[in-house]
Curated annotation (Swiss-Prot):
Any one GO MF annotation of this record: hormone activity
UniProt keyword annotations, A-Z: Amidation, Disulfide bond, Hormone, Neuropeptide, Secreted
Keyword Disulfide bond set for record: yes
Family: Belongs to the molluscan ELH family.
UniProt protein name: Califin-B
Leucine amide sites (modified residues): 36
Locations listed in the record: Secreted
């Protein structure tokens, strides 16, 4: 029983970390969009290299 509880706690922790990482990524993307000088920058592919969050 204790092992199952430990596994559930670890899983919950990992899911929480994953959600927080995605939220940080989305916040960075939003900020990057706000910081763009013009729509032309978007079409030049200047948003993020490889379209990924670091």
């Amino acid at each position: 029983i204790s092992i199952n509880q430990d596994l559930k706690a670890i899983t919950d922790m990992l899911l929480t970390e994953q959600i927080q990482a995605r939220q940080r990524c989305l916040a960075a993307l939003r900020q990057r969009l706000l910081d763009l000088d013009s729509d032309v920058s978007l079409f030049n592919g200047d948003l993020l290299p490889n379209g990924r969050c670091s």
